[in-house]
Amino acid sequence: MKLGWKPNKLTDKGSPIVDESVLSKIDNIAEAKLIAEYLLLKKRPSQISSWLDVVNQTTGRVHGRVLTLRCVSGRMSHHSPNMAQIPATYSPYGKECREVWTTDKPDTHVIFGTDASGLELRMLAHYINTPEYTHEILNGDIHTKNMNMAGLSDRDQAKTFIYAFLFGAGAKKIAQIIGSKDMAVGKKLIDKFLSELPRLKSFRSQVEEAAQSGKVKGLDGRLFNVRSAHKAVNTIIQGAGAIACKVWLRNMIKHVRTKGLDVKLVASIHDEYQFEVNKNDIQSMGEIVKLAIKETTEQLNLNCPLDAEYKTGLSWAETH
C-alpha cells in the first residue's frame, strides 16, 4: 500500500485481501506479479499432493466423493478430492494438471467428455420465455445481442457482464467490468439491459420479492433457501441447470444400460460429465448424449431447447 496500491477487496473486519487473484491484477507494481507467481507455484504442488493422497492402492484410481444435494442451488459438491477445483486447461499449468486424469486402458478406451451448451443462458431464456431472445441463443450470437442491449461496445465485456449479472453482481461490480469505479455507470448499464428485456425485469422482480420469505421455487418445484434477494435469480438459474443436468445424466445412463455399452462415469462437474468409453462405443455414446439432452428438454417442458457437445481423448486435458 506504501507503493500506491489501493485494495478493492476487504475482509469482514476491513483488512485488505491479498491473494493470488488480487496480486495478478496489479499492473503498476512489478513485485506483485512475482509474488502471485510464487503463490501459484506453492499451491500447485499442494493440489497435486492432495490427489496422490487419495489414490486407491488396490485399483490405482481416485474414487472421489460426490454429494448430490450439498449446494444451495442443487449442484453437486465434491471432496477427496474436490474435482471442481482441478485447474482448467487455460490456467497456468492447468493443461499439465488435467493430463494426469486419464484412462488406464489407453489401447481400448478413451476419456469422453460432454457438457451442456450455454446452460445458464438457456435457462434464463426458459424463464423469461422471449422468442426473440431464445432464437438468438439457438441461431444467432447471443453475446453480441447482449452487448447491444446493454449499450456496450465490446463482446467480451458483454460475456462478462451477463454472467456477472446472473450471479447477482451489483452496480459497483458491473461498472468495474468496463473499467469504471462509478456505481452510477453500472446502474445505467443494468437499467438499459433490463429495459430491453422487460420480461427479465419482471422475472427478476418476482423472484426477489419471493426471496423475501427466504425461499424460492426451483424448476421442478423444490424450494431453495436463499440468504439475500440479490442472489435469488442466480439460485433459480443455477438450480435449474443443476436439475436439468441430473435428469440428463439419468437419461444417458438409462440408454447406456439399455444398449449394454462399455461406459463408466468417472467425473461429474456441474454441467460437465466425463466418461471412460470403449473405443467401439464412441459413436453410440455420442448419439446418446444428444438424445438424452433432447429428452431432458421435453421432460422438463423447457421453453428453450438444451444441447450438448462432446470430445474424446486420452486425458481430461483433451476433453474439456
What function would you assign to each model-found segment?
Residues 1-93, 105-110, 117-120, 180, ...:
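Conserved "right-hand" nucleotidyltransferase catalytic core of DNA-directed polymerases
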Residues 97, 107-114, 123, 133:
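Feature marking long nucleic-acid-engaging regions of large polymerase/nuclease enzymes
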Residues 6-11, 128-140:
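Cytochrome P450 catalytic domain signature, combining two hallmark sequence patches
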Residues 120, 139, 143, 241, ...:
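Hydrophobic (often cysteine-bearing) scaffold residues that line and stabilize catalytic clefts
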Residues 26, 50-56, 87-89, 97, ...:
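Short, contiguous acidic/charged loop-to-helix segments that flank catalytic cores in large enzymes
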Residues 6-8, 28, 69, 148-269, ...:
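Conserved catalytic core of nucleic-acid polymerases
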Residues 1-4, 117-132, 147:
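Short active-site loop/helix that positions an aromatic residue
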Residues 291-300:
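A common structural junction motif
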